[in-house]
């Protein structure tokens, strides 16, 4: 038998009845990426990222997914930004060295060192100490009654509820309510109820 004489075997399989609507089949075909689309998508993405059909949603049709930059990802500064930072740092170094030169010249002429720098350091130390005291005061110590806050004059207590009548030290209700001593050594006398 010659190879030319061989017949091709063809299987005739009846096509299964399509359960999908022809419009749905067309939409699926449109969503399926073509090799050209895959090439276009991979051309724009970084080499590590592969374009996969899982990244697409059904509503996008045949357009490639628009990628948003990840806000958490590190993006290196541009060349212009680096050059700008270098010029700023060079300017600040030049200004600092000029100020040091001026101070050196003044000291050579006999001017004393400025006290402003020392005063600023002392003020910063005082601020840190006062902040530490405030923190210690807010924590309180064990067994101490907690206060609600610190006023300008010192700690203040929570005001009484509004439903109770306010009492100051001179009111008659408060004086009657307290036991009074008639003479030292005697027992307190309670006022008789009216």
Swiss-Prot record:
GO terms for cellular component: cytoplasm; cytosol; neuronal cell body; nucleus. One of its GO terms (molecular function) is protein phosphatase inhibitor activity. Keywords: Acetylation, Cytoplasm, Phosphoprotein, Protein phosphatase inhibitor. InterPro entries: PPP1R1A/B/C. Dopamine- and cyclic AMP-regulated neuronal phosphoprotein. Phosphorylation of Thr-34 is required for activity. The modification N-acetylmethionine is found at residue 1. Residues 1-194 are annotated as: Disordered. Belongs to the protein phosphatase inhibitor 1 family. This is Protein phosphatase 1 regulatory subunit 1B. The gene is Ppp1r1b.
């Amino acid at each position: 038998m010659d190879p030319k004489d061989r017949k091709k075997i063809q299987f005739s399989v009846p096509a299964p009845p399509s359960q999908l609507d022809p419009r749905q089949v067309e939409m699926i075909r449109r969503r399926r990426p073509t090799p050209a689309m895959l090439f276009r998508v991979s051309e724009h993405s970084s080499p590590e990222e592969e374009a996969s059909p899982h990244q697409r949603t059904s509503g996008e049709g045949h357009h490639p997914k628009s990628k948003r930059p990840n806000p958490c990802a590190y993006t290196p500064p541009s060349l212009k930004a680096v050059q700008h930072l270098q010029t700023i740092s060079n300017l600040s170094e030049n200004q600092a060295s000029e100020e040091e030169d001026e101070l050196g010249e003044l000291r050579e002429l006999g001017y004393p060192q400025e006290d402003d720098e020392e005063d600023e350091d002392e003020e910063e130390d005082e601020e840190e100490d006062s902040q530490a005291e405030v923190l210690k005061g807010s924590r309180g110590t064990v067994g101490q009654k907690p206060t609600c806050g610190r006023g300008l004059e010192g700690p203040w207590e929570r005001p009484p509820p509004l439903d109770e009548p306010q009492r100051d030290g001179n009111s008659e209700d408060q004086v009657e309510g307290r036991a009074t001593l008639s003479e030292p050594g005697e027992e307190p006398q309670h006022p008789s109820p009216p």
